[in-house]
């Protein structure tokens, strides 16, 4: 446990950031899973879910939660799934 006041504040700040980042990553993963499930089932709403998943991936990339190359790779794979 930190003894210095500023270090104690940083611990709180880091915990908040970790929670926010975990939530955003979870949202991204959920959006991808929803799209994959809809695509496998052949639902017409898969196109809308693809848009939502792409948006979630872009947000995670913008926030620095995932690398830009991973974001591009994930979006490319989802678009290929949609094309089939």
From Swiss-Prot:
The keyword Acetylation does not apply. Keywords: Ribonucleoprotein, Ribosomal protein, RNA-binding, rRNA-binding. GO terms for cellular component: cytosol; small ribosomal subunit. InterPro entries: Ribosomal_bS20, Ribosomal_bS20_sf. GO terms for molecular function: small ribosomal subunit rRNA binding; structural constituent of ribosome. Pfam families: Ribosomal_S20p. GO terms for biological process: translation. Binds directly to 16S ribosomal RNA. HAMAP family: Ribosomal_bS20. Belongs to the bacterial ribosomal protein bS20 family. NCBIfam families: S20. This is Small ribosomal subunit protein bS20. It comes from Latilactobacillus sakei subsp. sakei (strain 23K).
